[in-house]
């Protein structure tokens, strides 16, 4: 299935039904009172996050989604039926924005999360509501309210723990296929990857994490060059970036250090928060480098690149160094989760302390 990560749709809720201006008519009751029922509520348009859906392709071709109108009220105190709601199932990770106002309506980050995109109009009142001691035969009724109508932009930001950065043909697809269940297209030419790939890495029976591979970046990507700029947003939810560098490019005129710096510059120009994410350097294709030259080449790269963060040396093709990298990633992600859990627990601790102080004050009084 083709991966579609952006779509524009129109959500149109149903109009409320009109109230009825009706009077009771029965034999021997010539002056029956008002009995006009209310109109039904218009149907609403909802979105629900579904982890079984991976793309927005359905919304690329079906752009208008219209809920039913509420039925009009009738006599004999009959209320109109409510219009049927419609539910749009979207991938987890979908960001929904109102195109007219720029308001972010929802960020679907959890399976089953439900949000209203367009609310149906309220039904109008029948003349039954207008009866009073001075107006025994009211002819007033209220029309139903129109339903909401919204133009919406859908953006899919995949939910991954780790994101892969790198130039085209750096070996990202080979790496993700070696460590996970993902099977992206792998070939010896640039831009083999044309859309994001997700892979689940199982460390053991109980622990796993998700890796996202996006098309390779080139210089000028932040301004729209190449393919990768279209998919950089998929890295915004990750907790760790792996910058994969081809340590032994086929073209000897290519400088890996210059390419690595170009990637980082594009990242910074695109999004400062993405640039500030934890980032590890992964030097790939060691199998192509003679063993007696590896240490010197790695040392030279780090020196010229002026890198002070974590460095891993791997061969995505043979698997050399991949196991150590996987366990390091697992430890890093566990540390992040522990910090988040501790941060969430801190307010509870402060609240307990305040309650304890209040109890002590009451005891002294």
From Swiss-Prot:
Localization, UniProt: Cytoplasm
Cross-referenced InterPro entries: G_OBG, GTP-bd, GTP-bd_Obg/CgtA, GTP1-OBG_CS, GTP1_OBG_dom, GTP1_OBG_dom_sf, OBG_GTPase, P-loop_NTPase
Enzyme class at the top of the EC tree: hydrolase
Record GO biological process: ribosome biogenesis
Residues that, per the record, bind GTP: 166-173, 191-195, 213-216, 284-287, 315-317
GO molecular function, one term: GTP binding
Disulfide bonds: none
Record EC number: 3.6.5.-
Keywords, comma-separated and alphabetical: Cytoplasm, GTP-binding, Hydrolase, Magnesium, Metal-binding, Nucleotide-binding
Coiled-coil region list: none
Residues binding Mg(2+), per UniProt: 173, 193
Cross-referenced PROSITE patterns: G_OBG, GTP1_OBG, OBG
Cofactor(s) in the UniProt record: Mg(2+)
Pfam families attached to this UniProt entry: GTP1_OBG (PF01018), MMR_HSR1 (PF01926)
Function comment: An essential GTPase which binds GTP, GDP and possibly (p)ppGpp with moderate affinity, with high nucleotide exchange rates and a fairly low GTP hydrolysis rate. Plays a role in control of the cell cycle, stress response, ribosome biogenesis and in those bacteria that undergo differentiation, in morphogenesis control.
Protein name according to UniProt: GTPase Obg
Lineage: Bacteria, Pseudomonadati, Pseudomonadota, Betaproteobacteria, Burkholderiales
């Amino acid at each position: 299935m083709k991966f579609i990560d952006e779509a524009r749709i129109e959500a149109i809720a149903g109009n409320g039904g009109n109230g009825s201006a009706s009077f009771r008519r029965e034999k021997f009751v010539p002056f029956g009172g008002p009995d006009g029922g209310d109109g039904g509520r218009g149907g609403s348009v909802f979105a629900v996050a579904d982890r079984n859906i991976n793309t927005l392709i359905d919304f690329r071709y079906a752009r208008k989604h219209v809920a039913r109108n509420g039925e009009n009220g009738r006599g004999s105190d009959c209320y109109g039926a409510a219009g049927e709601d419609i539910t749009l199932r979207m991938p987890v990770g979908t960001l929904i924005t109102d195109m007219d106002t720029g308001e972010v309506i929802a960020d679907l980050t959890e399976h089953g999360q439900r949000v209203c995109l367009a609310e149906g109009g309220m039904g109008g009142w029948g003349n039954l509501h207008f009866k009073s001691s001075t107006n025994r035969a009211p002819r007033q009724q209220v029309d139903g309210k129109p339903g909401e109508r919204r133009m919406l932009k859908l953006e899919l930001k995949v939910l991954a723990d780790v994101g892969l950065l790198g130039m085209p043909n750096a070996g990202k697809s080979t790496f993700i296929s070696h460590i996970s269940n993902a099977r992206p297209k792998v070939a010896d030419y640039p831009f083999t990857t044309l859309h994001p790939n997700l892979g689940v890495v199982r460390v053991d029976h109980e622990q796993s994490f998700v890796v996202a591979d996006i098309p390779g970046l080139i210089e000028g990507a932040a301004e729209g060059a190449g393919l990768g700029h279209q998919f950089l947003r998929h890295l915004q939810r990750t907790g760790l970036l792996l910058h994969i560098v081809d340590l032994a490019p086929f073209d000897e005129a290519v400088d890996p250090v210059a390419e690595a710096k170009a990637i980082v510059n594009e990242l910074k120009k695109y999004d400062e928060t993405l640039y500030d994410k934890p980032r590890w350097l992964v030097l790939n294709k060691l199998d192509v480098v003679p063993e007696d030259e590896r240490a010197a080449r790695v040392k030279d790269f780090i020196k010229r690149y002026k890198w002070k963060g974590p460095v891993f040396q791997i061969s995505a093709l043979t698997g050399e160094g991949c196991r150590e990298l996987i366990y390091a990633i697992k430890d890093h992600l566990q540390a992040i989760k522990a910090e988040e859990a501790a941060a969430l627990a801190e307010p509870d601790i402060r609240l307990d302390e305040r309650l304890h102080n209040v109890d002590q004050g009451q005891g002294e009084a």
